[in-house]
């Protein structure tokens, strides 16, 4: 409630024309002042709202690795999305079972707050995922696998700024998978997708191949990020034509490990010793990823930021 001034009009003026005029003038001056304050408040908040609406925040999360990685995703993902005002989230889940992913693990990642799951070279390690790949449009396998294999390599998803495409490709340097050239596959999927923002998870080993892909798609994709190597790189950037990029997101998995594996097992492997099946150590985990801020009008990336969350 707005209280007008309670000052009494001098007695000499209370019953004459001047007194009435003075009261009216006092009322209208306060009304105008309150109205101007209200207009200023509305303009300020409308401007801020428009600024917020012009930004679209995408969270990309690195390879979920083992049971510890799954726990970390379930523990931290929603809070991280809230902290960065994330409207859309893509998580690479190809190592959720250590190597590969099961339908139950995919459901757990989606329930934890992921909008889409991407995969990589371990897609087929758990054959029970094949039917799930056919049935769910919220999990993608690399688009440059053979077309006859189960699943899809890209999808279009509705967001608050309209449709956004997510694509998954796999590299060929030091990889035994991906029969189609990923650069040719990128051209094809961009043509099929049409004129909407495209987010690409490029699951590749070589830094040079990832960088080349990013520059190849600069101005054509909203963001390109690398996965697979499990080590977060410090080169997040926005390329000259407006594509957000980072060479590798890192992983979601054990902090004290070699790419998620017990250190002693990895050391034995490099020493040429006999090794047992890889195991994932207990202990604290780290969630790694990046947030890409897109301009909702142009679909271009305006900023890229690394994120990490420790248990």
Predicted regions and their residues:
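Short linear/disordered segments characteristic of secreted peptide precursors
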Residues: 8-9, 44
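Serine residues within intrinsically disordered or low-complexity segments
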Residues: 5-6, 26-29
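Acidic, metal/ion-coordinating pockets
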Residues: 45-311
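Short, low-complexity segments with poor structural confidence in diverse proteins
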Residues: 1-2, 12, 31, 41
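Short, positively charged and aromatic/hydrophobic N-terminal segments
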Residues: 21, 30-35, 39-44, 48-50
